[in-house]
């Protein structure tokens, strides 16, 4: 077993990370111990469980990271997932001069934390689209429990190769709509067959990823934007069609109705180039 201490540039509020992670019942979060156990597939495709425990506080963030094997590979992934090499002070300084300054002051130090893999993120987005959040989490939980892997009490999303072999009825039995079953399985087949390479995405520009993924049946702009944000950690995404964002803006700016997309677009100009953080902090303001 290996252990490694990591210090991160402040501010970094890990308790708020745990708050958000705990919204998903699949995440192995222990708030009292201030830790999360993260399932990561190594290059061989095997599931490794990595524990991340907070030792410090938002002003002096320090973590103890531990696992059984593959220390170098796992540490690289943990730093990517938790965005430890991105300095939040630059983001906070930017928003201190904008109409979202109050929200950023209240939630200061909240990082943009990624899903544990791009495939996980893509499947979650496809499954969650056009569902209320409660049932969306129920459906992803059923999906992972039925076809994923459990190690040391922690659930990991299935491999695309596993889902590629399913029949649509296998997902219909979990209360997937027919279309959602088709989108989930067909996209997984593209990945398993090599028609869609997820390993290429980190090296592509946002616009090129949008053009590539939007051609896939069942993947629309909202899904691509969320994959860019929570799968790849891109900093400048603002999903205008997101109901949560619309509600957060309505509440923050005390509007009578949810804002139209052109209004949201005009508002968001001053928040660039950190629109993903504007999205995250607006969501946090209504959670």
UniProtKB/Swiss-Prot annotation:
Enzyme class at the top of the EC tree: hydrolase
Keywords on record: DNA damage, DNA repair, Hydrolase
Site (Determinant for substrate specificity and/or activity): residue numbering on this chain: 222
GO biological process: base-excision repair, AP site formation; DNA alkylation repair
Record-annotated active site: 242
UniProt similarity note: Belongs to the alkylbase DNA glycosidase AlkA family.
Domain of life: Bacteria
EC code: 3.2.2.21
GO cellular component terms, A-Z: cytoplasm; protein-DNA complex
PANTHER family attached to this UniProt entry: DNA-3-METHYLADENINE GLYCOSYLASE
Protein name: Putative DNA-3-methyladenine glycosylase YfjP
Catalytic activity reported: Hydrolysis of alkylated DNA, releasing 3-methyladenine, 3-methylguanine, 7-methylguanine and 7-methyladenine
Native species: Bacillus subtilis (strain 168)
An example Gene Ontology molecular-function term: DNA-7-methylguanine glycosylase activity
Biological function: Hydrolysis of the deoxyribose N-glycosidic bond to excise 3-methyladenine, 3-methylguanine, 7-methylguanine, O2-methylthymine, and O2-methylcytosine from the damaged DNA polymer formed by alkylation lesions.
């Amino acid at each position: 077993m290996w252990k490694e201490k990591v210090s991160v540039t402040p501010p970094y509020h890990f308790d708020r990370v745990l708050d958000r992670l705990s919204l998903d019942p699949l995440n192995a979060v222990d708030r009292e111990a201030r830790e999360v156990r993260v399932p990561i597939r190594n290059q061989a495709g095997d599931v490794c469980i990595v524990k991340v425990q907070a030792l410090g506080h938002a002003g002096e963030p320090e973590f103890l990271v531990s696992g059984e094997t593959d220390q170098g590979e796992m540490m690289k992934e943990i730093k990517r997932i938790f965005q430890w090499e991105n300095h939040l002070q630059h983001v906070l300084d930017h928003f201190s001069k904008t109409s979202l300054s109050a929200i950023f002051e209240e939630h200061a130090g909240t990082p943009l934390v990624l899903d544990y893999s791009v495939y996980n993120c893509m499947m979650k987005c496809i499954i969650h689209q056009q569902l209320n959040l409660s049932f969306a989490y129920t459906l992803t939980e059923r999906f992972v429990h039925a076809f994923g892997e459990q190690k040391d009490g922690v659930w990991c999303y299935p491999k695309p190769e596993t889902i590629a072999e399913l029949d649509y009825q296998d997902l219909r039995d979990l209360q997937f709509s027919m279309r959602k079953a088709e989108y989930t399985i067909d996209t997984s087949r593209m990945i398993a067959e090599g028609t869609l390479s997820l390993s290429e995405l980190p090296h592509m520009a946002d616009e090129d990823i949008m053009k590539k993924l939007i051609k896939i049946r069942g993947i629309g702009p909202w899904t691509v934007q969320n994959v860019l944000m929570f799968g790849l950690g891109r900093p400048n995404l603002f999903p205008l069609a997101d109901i949560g964002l619309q509600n957060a803006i309505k509440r923050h700016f005390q509007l009578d109705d949810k804002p139209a997309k052109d209004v949201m677009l005009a508002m968001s100009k001053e928040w660039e180039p950190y629109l993903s953080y504007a999205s995250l902090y607006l969501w946090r303001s209504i959670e």
